Amino acid sequence: MQQKIIKIKVGSKNPVKINAATKAMAQLFPESIIDASGMDAPSGVAAQPMTDKDTRQGAINRVHYCQQQDQQDTQADYYFAMEGGVDCFDFGPATFAYIAIGHKDQLAIGRSAILPLPMQVYRALEAGEELGHVMDRLFNTVNIKQKGGAIGLLTHGHATRESNYTQAIILAMAPLLNPDIYAQTC
């Protein structure tokens, strides 16, 4: 029996994001071959989104861009976008990511776990810096956003940006895996 190939397209060329989408889909569809590729997709929001709302919109914009740019003969089965952002909540500043998944005419949205941020990091973000650059400076690393991310640094490697995205993607897939029971909306 020939294995089914599931084509996925990720709205980024960042290997962390492509790997997260690939791992999540491989877990959800273990009998299938996952054919993943990435493409640059604009978020339409600031390079460092500073609100929950902007972060969510950035993920949605990226997934829609991927769907619009894909050629008929190379269309993917699923489109993924991950947008990392920060916000200041009642308990303090934190970083998180939104996940947008396009499948046929459906759009699924999810959000990752949050990581509390030190106030000094948040202040640098308010001043216009990106989280990856701030973390690189603080921890003397290079291009951490394409590795373990702030999550890896602040948890001493017990969690990573990729593991956080992978879990969020699996959870966001629930409506697409169970369309009959998710048919009703709020």
UniProtKB/Swiss-Prot annotation:
Top-level division of the source organism's lineage: Bacteria
Entry's cofactor comment: Binds 1 divalent metal cation per subunit; can use either Mg(2+) or Mn(2+).
Keyword Hydrolase (UniProt): yes
Keywords noted in UniProt: Hydrolase, Magnesium, Manganese, Metal-binding, Nucleotide metabolism, Nucleotide-binding
Any single GO BP term: thiamine metabolic process
Binding site for Mg(2+): 75
Cofactor(s) named in the record: Mg(2+); Mn(2+)
Pfam families per record: NTPase_I-T (PF01931)
Record field: catalytic activity: XTP + H2O = XDP + phosphate + H(+); ITP + H2O = IDP + phosphate + H(+)
Record-listed E.C. numbers: 3.6.1.73
NCBIfam families listed in its UniProt record: inosine/xanthosine triphosphatase (TIGR00258), PRK05074.1 (NF003459)
PANTHER family: NON-CANONICAL PURINE NTP PHOSPHATASE_PRRC1 DOMAIN-CONTAINING PROTEIN, PTHR34699
Function, as annotated: Phosphatase that hydrolyzes non-canonical purine nucleotides such as XTP and ITP to their respective diphosphate derivatives. Probably excludes non-canonical purines from DNA/RNA precursor pool, thus preventing their incorporation into DNA/RNA and avoiding chromosomal lesions.
Name by which UniProt lists this protein: Inosine/xanthosine triphosphatase
Lineage start: Bacteria, Pseudomonadati, Pseudomonadota, Gammaproteobacteria, Alteromonadales
